[in-house]
Amino acid sequence: MRPRAIRCIRCGAEGDLGGPFKGCPVCRANGKPSNVQVVYDDAELLPALRRVSSRPLELRNMWHYREVLPVSDDAIVTLGEGATPLLAAPRMGAKIGIPNLYLKVESRNPTSSFKDRLAAAAVSAARELGRKVVVGSSSGNAGAAVAAMAARAGMPCVMFTTQQFPLAMKTQMAIYGTYLLAAPTVQDRWSLMETGVDKLGWFPVDRKSVV
């Protein structure tokens, strides 16, 4: 479904769907960086929710709910993420006083992380907006998820990391063909990513960008 706008999760300021990729410009100007979220028209959202909730689970992934995700069908990038199982944990529940405790097994996702969900939606959005390269700043699961989805989409991926980058994560990202660049500090990662966004038109997938 096409959102009507993006809105700051802190101050409520709204902006256009093409950005901002650096979060809310109002909060940023006040020295308090804040993310933004998509906003739908209620007249379209409520019927879409009814359609999704009333039909059988036709797709065994998160795109079963595509009508209420901010990406058009022809832009979807997926590796089958989502629809992970719930497992009953009665003994653990009894110990902590929760009689009907269930655990969501997100390790069943393509890169063994719940972050595959965000990465799939973000890379799909990059495709829909016509961006040619995705970029992030991660040394962990988020970077691996973005790398996998970018590879699936056939899009180059640049990931800024630190010098203390774990070998296991480096290997996982490298398998997907990601360009890995180590920065001296965490802050340097974000500065370099910002340069790629501003100067080269890269699409950022990072906790400091649009959510």
Where would I find each of the regions flagged by the language model?
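PLP-dependent amino-acid enzyme catalytic core
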Residues: 1-211
